[in-house]
Amino acid sequence: MSGSNVVLCILDGWGNGSGGRYDAIHAAYTPFWDTAVSCCPMSSLSASGTDVGLPSGQVGNSEVGHISIGCGRIVLQDLLRINLEINEVHKNPKLLDFVRDIQAKGGVCHMIGLLSDGGVHSLQAHMETIIEVITGFGIKVFIHVILDGRDVPPRSAEKYIGMLNAKIEHLNAEIATVAGRYYAMDRDNRLDRTCKAYDAIAYATGPRSGSAMEALEKSYNSGVTDEFMVPTVIGDYDGMGAEDGVLFTNFRNDRVLQLLGMLLHRFPEVSNVLGMRQYSEKMRIASLFPPREIHRSLGEVISERGLKQLRIAETEKFAHVTFFFNGGREEPFTGEDRIIIPSPDVSTYDLKPEMSAVEITDSLVERINSQQYALTVVNYANADMVGHTGNMEAAKKAVTTVDSCLQRVFYAAVNAGAVMLITADHGNAEKMFDVQNDSPFTAHTSSMVPFVVCNADGDISLSDGRLCDVAPTVLDLMNIPQPSDMTGCSLITRNS
């Protein structure tokens, strides 16, 4: 029996909410979604904690979600892996090489990383452990703090800076620059933002304050929250030297690449660069925790069958449907086509909650109509990226936009005889306000996410499961045997 072509729609940040007043998905106008969940087979998937390879209770994120969906197994994520290994980092050969190089040249260490306990891109405890180790070798550490305010509350930096100051009080370390992640962790080629952070770190240019707390107070007094703090030089810091070493403490790669790339390109004299992980196959820097290869992902299985597949997303989420979905592989598989639609050029996405969803759908529908792809994977970024702004009305518009796009995809799938699957990578827009703290909620959630099958052959029902069960379910619909590497399970029951 030949299987069906499948269109897999991943709705970023679209969790199962409570239906309360701050649930943007429930509050938005979503006629297609309402019909789909009432008429099509539907179940719920766990997208956080140990079910996606994270520590218990840790919220999911886009990287982890796409890895789990695309690989069909629970992959031990960097956060949990580093948690297990960080106390032995003083023995890590790459760290020892890094230290020896600095000692031989008489330089200092520049440590760059996101300062929070959000656990999405970094963990402050990792940074603090490494600072203690490096200063223990007699090396001065300049810390280039990136403020979060996105995976944690928007005005929480005082807590994290206070914790860091307490940690380094008796160590040969100091905060050299402070910048919001809006500048230091852009991933949408807004190089003007990246350049402001780079100039502060490399050349000590930009606004200057006497201390990190003073800089934060000035920012708050100007109405600017953590994420958007303008890169600021602290104290007497005067920039990098060729004899120095640079260590990035973020373990997730997508929001490191622009700043790292700028450093490698514009300051090639600094050759001693170390990362928590291998951020890119093209940027060959040493890593404390090298990647572990993942074989027989969904994309690889489709390719091995000689079938064509398509990945499509806008800039903000393109890496997720390609690199992460393929288990950390940068190059496309044979037969894998990729389409990237530019994200809109706005400072924050609540200014354009539609983002590029309509343009994605225009291109996607054309490809579905061609019937050349056995598997099509699309990401709609709206609920997540607009959810991160904390703007409820904008989030509702974002959700409504995605709903209208899903309707177009559904009609195209039906006309092409394809099965349409709808799921999400993690929650976000279903919780837009934190009642306890009386402030907008901008972070991810630990909500379950939906899993809906539209236009399937025959009478089927779905079991609840985990994100890692999506790939086996796709293979089941395509009538392709599931490889033993995939430990997830098809969620389909065929009712005869």
Curated annotation (Swiss-Prot):
Coiled coil: none
Pathway: Carbohydrate degradation; glycolysis; pyruvate from D-glyceraldehyde 3-phosphate: step 3/5
Protein EC: 5.4.2.12
Residues given in the record as substrate binding sites: H121, R150, D151, R181, R187, R252, N253, D254, R255, K317
Any GO MF annotation of the entry: phosphoglycerate mutase activity
Uppermost EC category: isomerase
Entries under Gene3D superfamilies matching the protein: Alkaline Phosphatase, subunit A, BPG-independent phosphoglycerate mutase, domain B
Active site as annotated: S62 (phosphoserine intermediate)
UniProt KW keywords: Glycolysis, Isomerase, Manganese, Metal-binding
Cofactor note: Binds 2 manganese ions per subunit.
Cofactors: Mn(2+)
Positions with a binding annotation for Mn(2+) 2: D12, S62, D425, H426
GO BP term (any one): glycolytic process
Recorded family membership: Belongs to the BPG-independent phosphoglycerate mutase family.
Protein name in the entry: 2,3-bisphosphoglycerate-independent phosphoglycerate mutase
Native source organism of the sequence: Anaplasma phagocytophilum (strain HZ)
